[in-house]
A protein has these predicted regions:
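Residue in the alpha/beta-hydrolase core beta-strand immediately N-terminal to the catalytic nucleophile
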Residues: 96, 100-101, 131
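Lipolytic serine-hydrolase domain surface
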Residues: 9, 13, 17, 27-93, ...
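Short catalytic micro-motifs in class I SAM-dependent methyltransferases
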Residues: 1, 101, 109, 134
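Short substrate-entry loop that stabilizes the transition state in hydrolases
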Residues: 2-8, 22
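Gly/Ala-rich beta-loop-alpha elbow adjacent to hydrolase catalytic centers
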Residues: 65, 99-103, 107
Length: 205
């Protein structure tokens, strides 16, 4: 939301450059590769129709993310000793997932699709860390019978970063009639979070 294609690609490139700024001085440190998943966006902030349009496009794009997760799982299976292709050389790197703002809404619905595509089996652990930055999803999304209750299965660790001064959260909360946002004040019941899920309050940063 409020990010057009050019801004999304520019942000991804800037992140990759930042993560690799020290690797050129250290021959043993490997470069980090950033892969961007984007969806149609109006790139506007204050227009209600733009927000709703972006939200619908985000939801409709989530099936592609779910399919991508399964393709990644199948590829990682080929790296197991019993199935390993001798032509594939492992890089030894870890995989992380970063979702920003409405990207967490994409992830939310991707989990619903993944559950169906995976025949309701346990989610594969694909990532070392999932970073949920300013998540534009409900603040009770990790509770029982909600779509992110099993997100922790996808990674060894999940971290939520929230900011109670985030303008986009206000727009989502009050203009669109959504329930309280996870990216605004964190989870509704922090004591019920899975032990792999933690929160960081970025309001004073």
């Amino acid at each position: 939301f409020n990010v057009d294609w050019f801004e999304a690609v520019s942000s991804a490139l800037a992140l990759e450059l930042m993560l690799n700024r020290h690797s050129h001085d250290d021959d043993e440190q490997k470069d980090t590769s950033v892969f961007l998943f984007s969806w149609p966006s109006n790139g506007a902030m204050m227009k209600n129709k733009a927000y709703l349009s972006d939200r619908n496009d985000a939801r409709d794009s989530s099936i592609a993310v779910a399919r991508g997760f399964l393709k990644l799982r199948d590829f990682l299976m080929t790296l197991r000793p019993t199935h390993k292709d001798p032509l594939i050389e492992e890089c030894g790197q870890q995989l992380h997932l970063l979702c920003h703002s409405m990207g967490n809404y994409v992830l939310q619905h991707a989990l619903v699709s993944l559950d169906k595509l995976n025949n309701h089996k346990h989610f594969p652990q694909l990532f070392q860390h999932i970073f949920m930055c300013a998540p534009d999803v409900d603040d009770n999304i990790f509770e029982e019978d909600r779509s992110m209750v099993n997100l922790h299965m996808l990674a060894k660790q999940v971290t939520v970063y929230y900011n109670n001064g985030d303008l986009a959260m206000y727009i989502s909360d009050y203009t669109q009639g959504n329930t309280d946002r996870l990216g605004h004040n964190g989870t509704h019941r922090p004591m019920q979070l899975h032990n792999k899920v933690s929160q960081v309050n970025c309001s004073k940063i």
